[in-house]
């Protein structure tokens, strides 16, 4: 978990999508057949985009609706100038409500989807409890929580309260039989200042992203509060639960001297043949980076800034997906969730020079509905998403330069980059460490150009860095070699 600093601190801050176009819908029969086709194709993993326009809706089908009749009658009383003014105003309002971070979509989520999710979970009995789980082994520990592996017990299973599973027994367990549904559990620390608060925030952000951008983070199953105290649980303590997708994060893989080759078969399904060693490593890093930035683009589109992007918070699934975890430091700048102006949450090794996701003079957020209405203006003026993009640049540099993967190497880099005012080109000329930049220099230095546009100061206009969407349009990604390798590997397995 990130650390806390006060404002008095004297430092400065997927695969290519197929575009499947379908014919316009003209009759209810066509709608039925089209829907069955869409359902079949979606199960096969094809992303559908229907070519549909309002002209395809018969006017007679709306004429019997009272609101439509009232609208037509009101519009008929308008002059041509008034009609133009009405439609222009409606267009501006629509553009504003749908601009990032999504006032309209956020309102639908908050007032419709979130209560609906809670109601459905309660109705079908999906609420979790302590006796549903068997904790197997400890995986790690942070400032505010302890992470464990575990299993979801069958409904007819009985659990002895004081049972403790040894590490050896956990490894010997059959995860294809009775204990087939593995989970990751995080115990929110009890009695630690700030732990309960961050546990609440992490739960909220995981629920929010499970609805808005489910493929960006590990699948969140919910939470429970322990109802009694024993060797593992403390009464009243909160636990968060995710479906098991992998027990190793990017930092774990980067500790291995063979990185990034140790991820080759995971990312591409096989070892790439006929590709030079340096180019193979570059393709692996590019595929990892593409997934990271794609996930950031999606969460930024919801108004959320992670604020703690680093290898330890990027889990690698067994299917070769990179997913964000640990949202305790995240902020939803659409409604001001977990944003407090007088403090900042950061890891000093990965945070940008501005330290704060918004300028220090930004006031405390108003009530949520007002904050949501003002959020598009705040976002356009301050581009808070660029906070995460600096951290993403550090991750790219670490993956590409072996000497920066160690704690000491990264700290030394941060001292050097600060001394040259966060200008990577000047750092390259002056550093005494002689880093190996061969991976970034491939393809006419496209990787180096990208990283210099991520690791930089914001400037007076609070721009100066690429957003996630702009980074994905950079020539480094447009070459698509990593995507081609991934597609070819899937084709070879399907034969």
Curated annotation (Swiss-Prot):
Positions that bind ATP: 139-147, 186
Subcellular location per the Swiss-Prot or TrEMBL entry: Plastid, Chloroplast thylakoid
Residues of the Protein kinase domain: 133-477
Protein's organism: Arabidopsis thaliana
Chloroplast in keyword set: yes
Keywords: ATP-binding, Chloroplast, Kinase, Nucleotide-binding, Plastid, Serine/threonine-protein kinase, Thylakoid, Transferase, Transit peptide
Any single biological process term in GO: photosystem II stabilization
Phenotypic consequence of gene deletion: Not significantly affected in state transitions. Enhanced thylakoid folding and reduced mobility of thylakoid proteins under low-light conditions.
Active site residues per record: 308 (proton acceptor)
Protein name (database record): Serine/threonine-protein kinase STN8, chloroplastic
GO cellular component terms attached to this protein's record: chloroplast; chloroplast thylakoid; thylakoid
PANTHER family linked: SERINE/THREONINE-PROTEIN KINASE STN8, CHLOROPLASTIC-RELATED, SERINE_THREONINE-PROTEIN KINASE STN8, CHLOROPLASTIC
Transit peptide feature, positions: 1-49
Catalytic activity: L-seryl-[protein] + ATP = O-phospho-L-seryl-[protein] + ADP + H(+); L-threonyl-[protein] + ATP = O-phospho-L-threonyl-[protein] + ADP + H(+)
Listed Gene3D superfamilies: Phosphorylase Kinase, domain 1 (3.30.200.20), Transferase(Phosphotransferase) domain 1 (1.10.510.10)
Entry function: Light-dependent serine/threonine protein kinase that specifically phosphorylates N-terminal threonine residues in psbA/D1, psbD/D2, psbC/CP43 and psbH, which are components of the core antenna complex of photosystem II. Phosphorylation of PSII core components facilitates the exchange of chlorophyll proteins between the grana and the stroma lamellae. Also involved in the phosphorylation of the calcium-sensing receptor (CaS).
Assigned EC number: 2.7.11.1
A Pfam family recorded for this sequence: Pkinase
Similarity field: Belongs to the protein kinase superfamily. Ser/Thr protein kinase family.
Keyword GTP-binding carried by entry: no
Top EC group: transferase
CDD domains listed in its UniProt record: STKc_SNT7_plant (cd14013)
GO molecular function, one term: protein kinase activity
């Amino acid at each position: 978990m990130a650390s806390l600093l006060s404002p008095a601190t004297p430092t400065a801050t997927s695969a290519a999508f197929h575009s499947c176009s379908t014919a316009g819908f003209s009759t209810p029969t066509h709608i039925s057949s089209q829907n069955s086709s869409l359902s079949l194709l979606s199960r096969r993993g094809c992303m559908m985009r229907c070519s549909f326009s309002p002209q395809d809706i018969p006017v007679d089908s709306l004429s019997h609706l009272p609101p439509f009749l009232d609208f037509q009658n009101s519009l008929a009383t308008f002059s041509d100038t008034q009609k133009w003014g009405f439609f222009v105003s409606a267009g501006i309002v629509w553009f504003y409500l749908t601009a990032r971070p999504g006032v309209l979509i956020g309102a639908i989520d908050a007032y419709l989807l979130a209560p609906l999710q809670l109601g459905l979970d309660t109705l079908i009995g999906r609420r979790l409890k302590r006796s549903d789980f068997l904790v197997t082994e400890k995986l790690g520990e942070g400032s505010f929580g302890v992470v464990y592996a575990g299993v979801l017990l069958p409904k007819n299973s009985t659990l002895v309260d004081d049972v403790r599973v040894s590490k050896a027994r956990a490894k010997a367990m059959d995860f294809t039989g009775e204990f087939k549904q593995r989970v990751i559990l995080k115990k929110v620390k009890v009695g630690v200042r700030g732990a309960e608060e961050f546990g609440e925030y992490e739960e909220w952000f995981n629920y929010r992203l499970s609805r808005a951008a489910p493929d960006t983070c590990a699948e969140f199953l919910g939470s429970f509060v322990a109802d009694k105290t024993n060797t593992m649980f403390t009464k009243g303590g909160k636990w968060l639960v995710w479906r098991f997708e992998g027990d190793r994060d990017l930092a774990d893989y980067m500790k291995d001297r063979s990185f990034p080759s140790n991820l080759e078969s995971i990312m591409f399904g096989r070892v790439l043949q006929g590709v030079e060693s340096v180019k193979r490593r570059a393709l692996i890093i590019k595929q990892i980076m593409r997934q990271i930035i794609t996930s950031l683009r999606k969460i930024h589109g919801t108004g959320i800034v992670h604020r703690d992007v680093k290898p330890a918070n990027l889990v690698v699934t067994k299917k070769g997906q990179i997913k964000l975890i640990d949202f305790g430091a995240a902020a939803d700048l659409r409604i001001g969730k977990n944003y407090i102006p007088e403090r900042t949450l950061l890891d000093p090794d990965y945070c940008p020079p501005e330290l704060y996701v918004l300028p220090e003079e930004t006031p405390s957020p108003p009530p949520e509905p007002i904050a949501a209405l003002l959020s598009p203006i705040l976002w356009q003026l301050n581009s808070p998403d660029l906070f995460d993009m600096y951290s993403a640049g550090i991750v790219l540099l670490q993956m590409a330069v072996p000497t920066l993967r160690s704690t000491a190497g990264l700290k030394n880099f941060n001292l050097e980059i600060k001394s040259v005012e966060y200008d990577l080109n000047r750092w390259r000329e002056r550093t005494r460490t002689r880093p190996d930049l061969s991976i970034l220099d491939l393809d006419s230095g496209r990787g180096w150009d990208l990283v210099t546009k991520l690791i930089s100061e914001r400037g007076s206009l609070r721009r100066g860095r690429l957003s996630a969407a702009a980074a994905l349009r950079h020539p480094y990604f447009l070459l698509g070699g990593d995507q081609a390798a991934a597609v070819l590997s899937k084709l070879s397995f399907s034969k």
